[in-house]
Amino acid sequence: MEILITYAIIFLLAWGLGAYMSRVFSSERTWLDFLKPLEHGIYWLLRIDPTRGMTWRGYALAILWTNLPLALLGYLVFIWQANLPLNPDKISGMSWDLALHTAASFITNTNQQHYSGQSQMSYLSQLVGVTAMQFVTPAVGLAAMVAVLRGLMGGMGGAKGNLGNYYVDLTRAITRVLIPMSFVLALLLTWQGVPSTFSGAKTATLLEPQTVSAKVISSQTIPVGPVAAMVAIKQLGTNGGGWYGPNSAVPLENPKIGRAHV
């Protein structure tokens, strides 16, 4: 019965979300229209004309232009994280090859991890590097999907060859779909016990000290951080790569059965 209820909830959410996203990308009225000033501020800042349609070539080039600078930013943050803020645990910078692999992996939505985030990434790297790409790459996927559908339906507004404006689609995917849903999901995860803090790692005293190689170990270090914020978009955007090396196998990412349903 529990499985049937879970699938029923998923079906209802998928139907409602699909209808909502259709309105978002069709420029119809939604309950998040109050974000229009923010979106137009982004267009103005980036010198984007939101009314200009794009052909498939223009759309594809715009995707590359968006992804490459973000990958470079992530790479630089990874290798310089030791000298940047939000590093309470004093984690050293990544090697150039590991940083390159990580940036390439997350910007392509491959999300392969050759690192353990809790011990090899600062909070800044986790948020500005990894989490930012976990927002942008699924948003790019949504925008590309919308462009393909417009092409199959004869072009935006019936104008053949007009796939819409990539930057508008990308912005709406982030501001009206991913961020609102991630915000709610992060609150639910925090409620379920997933860490959500900018303080450094915690030290806990063991109830039963252990002896390893003639050395008595009486305490352990528990890495924390703004984990819930990353896990929310990781799951929502079908991203891999969690805050911790073993991902959701770690109790701190997956503390209760309710979190699994979320």
Task: Kindly label every feature range from the protein language model.
Residues 22-29, 147-154, 241-246:
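Juxtamembrane interface at the ends
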Residues 85-130, 196-261:
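P-loop potassium selectivity filter motif centered on the GYG triad
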Residues 1-101, 158-164, 168-209:
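N-terminal alpha-helical transmembrane segments of multi-pass membrane transport
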Residues 26, 47, 105, 153, ...:
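Generic surface-pattern signal
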Residues 10-34, 39, 126-141, 249-261:
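Short secondary-structure boundary segments
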